[in-house]
UniProtKB/Swiss-Prot annotation:
Name under which the protein is recorded: NAD(P)H-quinone oxidoreductase subunit I
This protein's encoding gene: ndhI
Major localization listed first in the record, in broad terms: membrane
Organism, as annotated: Prochlorococcus marinus (strain MIT 9215)
Keywords recorded for this protein, A-Z: 4Fe-4S, Iron, Iron-sulfur, Membrane, Metal-binding, NAD, NADP, Plastoquinone, Quinone, Repeat, Thylakoid, Translocase
GO biological-process terms attached to the record: photosynthesis, light reaction
Catalytic EC class: translocase
Catalytic activity: a plastoquinone + NADH + (n+1) H(+)(in) = a plastoquinol + NAD(+) + n H(+)(out); a plastoquinone + NADPH + (n+1) H(+)(in) = a plastoquinol + NADP(+) + n H(+)(out)
Lineage, uppermost ranks: Bacteria, Bacillati, Cyanobacteriota, Cyanophyceae, Synechococcales
Length: 208
């Protein structure tokens, strides 16, 4: 009799624990169902990078003075600066400039320390290729203007992961029913800019 009662007691405990574990697992599942997904339908949808995004480096050949500061501050000595000394002017003449993005870590040191601002970080991140040698950009490829997601009519730009509402740190925290997930900087400026009538009222109040 005691063994039978012990078996029933253990069975009830196991059933209770199983129900508790099932409830914990389903609670996590239903919690994620109420959240907004963070996946995008690439390449038909693309994220808008943030303002300080470190993408492909843009290079302006005419501004470069071949000082090689970018080479010295680069952690891996990546930029290749090909120059010759002009004996008449006693100045450097730049022949070629190249960066291998297959090795670049996009730290931005070359952009930060460039004395002539001939280097800049762009928002371009689509550098995939079938041949790694195609990632070695010369001064012509580096001088190409970057592509902009917001001006491409073939894709739908998404701002969810770049510009979140105030106080939100994780895109998962945005409810699925919320259609306004964030604002671009120019939209924030337009929203904060007072109406013309408000300015007139303020001026009239100050005069009175």
């Amino acid at each position: 009799m005691n063994n039978f009662l012990q078996q029933i007691n253990s069975y009830i405990k196991e059933a209770f624990n199983a129900g508790k574990y099932l409830y914990n697992g389903l609670s996590v599942t239903f919690d994620h169902l109420r959240r907004r997904p963070v996946t995008v339908q690439y390449p038909y949808e693309k994220l808008i990078p943030s303002e300080r995004y470190r993408g492909r480096i843009h290079y302006e050949f005419d501004k470069c003075i071949a000082c090689e500061v970018c080479v010295r501050v680069c952690p891996i000595n990546l930029p290749v600066v090909d120059w010759v000394m002009n004996k008449e002017t006693k100045k450097k003449e730049l022949r070629n400039y190249s960066i291998d993005f297959g090795v670049c870590i996009f730290c931005g040191n070359c952009v930060e320390y460039c004395p002539t601002n001939c280097l800049s970080m762009t928002e371009e991140y689509e550098l995939a290729t079938f041949d790694r040698h195609n990632l070695n950009f010369d001064n012509v490829a580096l001088g190409r203007l970057p592509t902009n997601v917001t001006t491409d009519p073939s894709v739908k730009p998404l701002r969810e992961l770049a510009y979140l509402p105030k106080g939100v740190m994780d895109p998962h925290e945005i409810p699925a029913s919320d259609t306004r997930v964030g604002k671009l900087p120019e939209e924030v400026y337009d929203w904060m800019r007072p109406e013309p009538n408000e300015n007139k009222d303020k001026v009239s109040n100050q005069i009175n």
